[in-house]
């Protein structure tokens, strides 16, 4: 078991501990539960889906990286496939506050980058901030997404974001988590191809500036993140953050990164290079390359 889970795990009910122990045994537990695993946990504990998600939130929050605030937020995004995806907030010392990842963004990106097609619900241990409510409004589940908070009845996103502004106001038809392929040819080595593939999946209807980042770890594992724009612009999630979300949730740390590649267009209206390089250098990665999409 990864050390970060030990404290939270010890506080779980005995029957949940017994059912989870084999799943958490791998130090690189992928921070997700398949539909089959969810069903097994429900059977072992007698909990329904909502109660189980709340019980698991401390494990999601244990994935938080909060050296600045020390305020750990956990989220669990429930995919329509039946898979549950953990998420947690991340702060980056030496970078800017704007590079921060919120727990809801983490769980949603985890699901999206894992190939999930849509979300049915999200469970969070604290009320979503306005930034996250706006981020969620970009999803193809829209204002119908169910939000579950401790001690409250579940409500749809529309209840947390009345008079919402979103992609439909800008006549955007393709939404976040819809399947997209921008068709750039995969060239170069495996890391370059992973970055290009991530750029191909970008959700960037506002700027038309595709980008993707791929991180190579010392053991050869590659994590890639795609750019995810938002109708309100500021809640946009850069591609580096997508890759760092996966790296963190899969049990890796920043010193494990040995090389990074950003794929983007040289003439795009928005450029990721400076912010990507600065944040990676703050995390200790200095081997950073750029592949230009043609």
From Swiss-Prot:
Binding site for substrate: 89-91
GO biological process: cytidine deamination
Cofactor: Zn(2+)
GO molecular function: cytidine deaminase activity; identical protein binding; zinc ion binding
Enzyme Commission no: 3.5.4.5
The CMP/dCMP-type deaminase domain, residue ranges: 48-168, 186-294
Entry keyword set: Hydrolase, Metal-binding, Zinc
GO cellular component: cytosol
Top-level taxon of the source organism: Bacteria
Catalytic activity: cytidine + H2O + H(+) = uridine + NH4(+); 2'-deoxycytidine + H2O + H(+) = 2'-deoxyuridine + NH4(+)
Catalytic residues in the record: 104
Keyword Zinc among record annotations: yes
Cofactor details (free text): Binds 1 zinc ion.
PANTHER family: CYTIDINE DEAMINASE (PTHR11644:SF2)
Name assigned to this protein: Cytidine deaminase
Protein species of origin: Escherichia fergusonii (strain ATCC 35469 / DSM 13698 / CCUG 18766 / IAM 14443 / JCM 21226 / LMG 7866 / NBRC 102419 / NCTC 12128 / CDC 0568-73)
Lineage: Bacteria, Pseudomonadati, Pseudomonadota, Gammaproteobacteria, Enterobacterales
């Amino acid at each position: 078991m990864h050390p970060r889970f030990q404290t939270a795990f010890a506080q779980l009910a005995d029957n949940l501990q017994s059912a989870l122990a084999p799943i958490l045994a791998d130090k690189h537990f992928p921070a997700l539960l398949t539909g089959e695993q969810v069903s097994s946990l429900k059977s072992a504990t007698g909990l329904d889906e909502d109660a189980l998600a709340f019980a698991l939130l401390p494990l999601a929050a244990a994935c938080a990286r909060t050296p600045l605030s020390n305020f750990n937020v956990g989220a669990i995004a429930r995919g329509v496939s039946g898979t549950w995806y953990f998420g947690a907030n991340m702060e980056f010392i030496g970078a800017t506050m704007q590079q921060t990842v919120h727990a809801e963004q983490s769980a949603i990106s985890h699901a999206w980058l894992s190939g999930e097609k849509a979300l049915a619900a999200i469970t969070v241990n604290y009320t979503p901030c306005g930034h996250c409510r706006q981020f969620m409004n970009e999803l193809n589940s829209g204002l119908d997404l169910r939000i579950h908070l401790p001690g409250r009845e579940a409500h749809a996103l529309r209840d947390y974001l009345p008079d919402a502004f979103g992609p439909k106001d800008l006549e955007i038809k393709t939404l976040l988590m819809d399947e997209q392929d921008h068709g750039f040819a995969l060239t170069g080595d495996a890391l370059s191809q992973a970055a290009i593939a991530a750029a191909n999946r970008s959700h960037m209807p506002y700027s038309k500036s595709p980008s993707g980042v791929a991180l190579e770890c010392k053991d050869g594992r590659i994590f890639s993140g795609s750019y995810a724009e938002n109708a309100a612009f500021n809640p946009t999630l850069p591609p580096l953050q997508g890759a760092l979300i996966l790296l963190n949730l899969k049990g890796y740390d920043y010193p494990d990164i040995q090389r990074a590649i950003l794929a983007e267009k040289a003439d795009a209206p928005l450029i990721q290079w400076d912010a990507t390089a600065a944040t990676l250098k703050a995390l200790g990665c200095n081997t950073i390359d750029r592949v230009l999409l043609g």
